[in-house]
Amino acid sequence: MSSFTTTNTPPPYLLRKIYHRRVNQPFSVVCCTGEPQQDIFTRRRTLTSLITFTVIGGATSSALAQEKWGTRSFIKEKYFMPGLSPEDAAARIKQTAEGLRDMREMLDHMSWRYVIFYIRLKQAYLSQDLTNAMNILPESRRNDYVQAANELVENMSELDFYVRTPKVYESYLYYEKTLKSIDNVVEFLA
């Protein structure tokens, strides 16, 4: 018999190549000679310990940590202490009014990016603060307060829109309207 008829294995060009794919290599393929092999978990342990010590260090009290409002702690405010007391909410609204007055210089320099960031930061918690601060007011003044608060929210959203475009005249116009409406809200809370 010929060798062509008795072969049990197929020819090499018909064989399917077997690819073994490693998902995670246990060590780096390229390494320098003379240096010890780096443990795979070294970076993870370092990062975990850094985050742990940062959180523990952040738990200590300082002047900024005692302050219950401000731009430095907006992540903490939004996710870890969303519900302030009505007095704290009123104080944060007053501080927002002062911050909006200080924003004039950013508008004069036309640094729109910072203005947008500041407006959106304040808008994020202002509606909740306005609702919380309403509990301080007597029933007879609440309707007027709600109208002033709605006007403030509307003016801030218009200011945000015109700063995004950026239209200079309209931005200044709604900036002044926002200042006027936040002053009306602060009058109710005083």
UniProtKB/Swiss-Prot annotation:
Reported phenotype of the disruption mutant: Impaired chloroplastic NAD(P)H dehydrogenase (NDH) activity leading to the loss of post-illumination increases in Chl fluorescence, probably due to a reduced stability of the NDH complex.
Membrane topology value: Peripheral membrane protein
One annotated GO molecular function: electron transporter, transferring electrons within the cyclic electron transport pathway of photosynthesis activity
SUPFAM superfamilies linked: Oxygen-evolving enhancer protein 3
Organelle transit peptide: 1-31, 32-68
Main location: plastid
Assembly with partners or alone: Part of the chloroplast NDH complex, composed of a mixture of chloroplast and nucleus encoded subunits. Component of the NDH lumenal subcomplex, at least composed of PnsL1, PnsL2, PnsL3, PnsL4 and PnsL5.
Stated family: Belongs to the PsbQ family.
Protein's UniProt name: Photosynthetic NDH subunit of lumenal location 2, chloroplastic
Lineage of origin: Eukaryota, Viridiplantae, Streptophyta, Embryophyta, Tracheophyta
